[in-house]
Amino acid sequence: LALTLPWVLFPTPTSRWLNNRLLTLQNWFIGRFGHELFTPVNLPGHKWAVLLTSLMLFLISLNMLGLLPYTFTPTTQLSLNMGLAFPLWLATVIIGMRNQPTEALGHLLPEGTPTLLIPVLIVIETISLFIRP
């Protein structure tokens, strides 16, 4: 299963007018995967479709390597996970701050906070924002 997965997941381009069954199945799988991933996301968020779909297919194929005996999956390394997660996290935080600054800053203070706790909670929430990746 792990050896055939890259062959099944990634379609090969062809110059034919009509696709064969395997290429049609591959394109259907990738299209369906993208549809399922972005059904709950609004229309401006669909510009992330290519990046997130390719990232998910990459992670699936790397994790399928773990099915092979005596192999080590690269996703167990923290350096690979941080290398993939940190730029995406930073991009979403920066885009959120740029597009909706009041709502993004509003997440730094929970509703109903007593006045004496406001400075402390803003510092705590800011630290927790940067600890997330």
Swiss-Prot record:
One of its GO terms (biological process) is proton motive force-driven ATP synthesis. This is ATP synthase F(0) complex subunit a. It comes from Thunnus obesus. PANTHER family: ATP SYNTHASE SUBUNIT A (PTHR11410:SF0). Belongs to the ATPase A chain family. Subunit a, of the mitochondrial membrane ATP synthase complex (F(1)F(0) ATP synthase or Complex V) that produces ATP from ADP in the presence of a proton gradient across the membrane which is generated by electron transport complexes of the respiratory chain. ATP synthase complex consist of a soluble F(1) head domain - the catalytic core - and a membrane F(1) domain - the membrane proton channel. These two domains are linked by a central stalk rotating inside the F(1) region and a stationary peripheral stalk. Keywords: ATP synthesis, CF(0), Hydrogen ion transport, Ion transport, Membrane, Mitochondrion, Mitochondrion inner membrane, Transmembrane, Transmembrane helix, Transport. The keyword ATP-binding does not apply. It holds the Pfam family ATP-synt_A. SUPFAM superfamilies: F1F0 ATP synthase subunit A. Component of the ATP synthase complex composed at least of ATP5F1A/subunit alpha, ATP5F1B/subunit beta, ATP5MC1/subunit c (homooctomer), MT-ATP6/subunit a, MT-ATP8/subunit 8, ATP5ME/subunit e, ATP5MF/subunit f, ATP5MG/subunit g, ATP5MK/subunit k, ATP5MJ/subunit j, ATP5F1C/subunit gamma, ATP5F1D/subunit delta, ATP5F1E/subunit epsilon, ATP5PF/subunit F6, ATP5PB/subunit b, ATP5PD/subunit d, ATP5PO/subunit OSCP. One of its GO terms (molecular function) is proton-transporting ATP synthase activity, rotational mechanism. It catalyses: H(+)(in) = H(+)(out). The chain crosses the membrane at residues 48-68, 77-97, 111-131. It is a multi-pass membrane protein. The keyword Protein transport does not apply. It is found in: Mitochondrion inner membrane. One of its GO terms (cellular component) is proton-transporting ATP synthase complex.
